[in-house]
Amino acid sequence: MSAVAINHFFGLPEAIEKLILPISRSGESNNESRGRGSSNNIPIDILESPKEYIFYLDIPGISKSDIQVTVEEERTLVIKSNGKRKRDDDESEEGSKYIRLERRLAQNLVKKFRLPEDADMASVTAKYQEGVLTVVIKKLPPQPPKPKTVQIAVS
């Protein structure tokens, strides 16, 4: 499958993604809050093999129980998390404070992907290990083309 076709199935232009993704509590869309823990900053790799599609998302520090992976109508894979990363300062000495804090994570992660026709919606599996969420979707076997008889109109 070409890169253009994969982009058609998996990638949404930012303008469309902005419409689909929910608005944050502050009223900003996820695209507008870029750089402040936006879910658009979550690195994602999508691998297509001959037998399956594999999604890799880096979301360190979130509890596995706070991550939801669902398949919605219209062949849409949805990955959500409302979890908050636990900071090391919960256990630090009283009077300690961060002087630099760059490792922020989306507070409300929502990622949606339109899946291709050959994705087997019943075979979706997910695992979360060492801060990486891996979602695997098997491919359906190719369907042989069905011949279609066309009626010829007589005029």
Curated annotation (Swiss-Prot):
An annotated GO cellular component: cytoplasm
Localization annotation: Cytoplasm
InterPro entries named in the record: A-crystallin/Hsp20_dom, HSP20-like_chaperone, Small_HSP
Pfam families assigned: HSP20
The entry's keywords: Cytoplasm, Stress response
A GO BP entry: cellular response to hypoxia
Major localisation: cytoplasm
Positions of the sHSP domain: 35-155
Key word DNA damage present: no
Name this polypeptide is given: 17.4 kDa class III heat shock protein
Source organism: Arabidopsis thaliana
